[in-house]
Amino acid sequence: MTIAFQLAVFALIATSSILLISVPVVFASSDGWSSNKNIVFSGTSLWIGLVFLVAILNSLIS
């Protein structure tokens, strides 16, 4: 169970880092938002899901 928690935390940190870099790049590009809107929403949905997964796994470990 601890390994699953650690992998979920790593995935959350990696997703956060990717979104931290990619979202400003998408907004700064000229046609970026209209062409990459689905990717940004998918990444945000993944991030929210990982937050809940980490919270659930944390409650099971503690």
Curated annotation (Swiss-Prot):
It is a multi-pass membrane protein. Disulfide bonds: none annotated. GO terms for biological process: photosynthesis; photosystem II stabilization. May control the interaction of photosystem II (PSII) cores with the light-harvesting antenna, regulates electron flow through the 2 photosystem reaction centers. PSII is a light-driven water plastoquinone oxidoreductase, using light energy to abstract electrons from H(2)O, generating a proton gradient subsequently used for ATP formation. PSII is composed of 1 copy each of membrane proteins PsbA, PsbB, PsbC, PsbD, PsbE, PsbF, PsbH, PsbI, PsbJ, PsbK, PsbL, PsbM, PsbT, PsbY, PsbZ, Psb30/Ycf12, at least 3 peripheral proteins of the oxygen-evolving complex and a large number of cofactors. It forms dimeric complexes. PANTHER family: PHOTOSYSTEM II REACTION CENTER PROTEIN Z (PTHR34971:SF2). This is Photosystem II reaction center protein Z. It comes from Amborella trichopoda. The gene is psbZ.
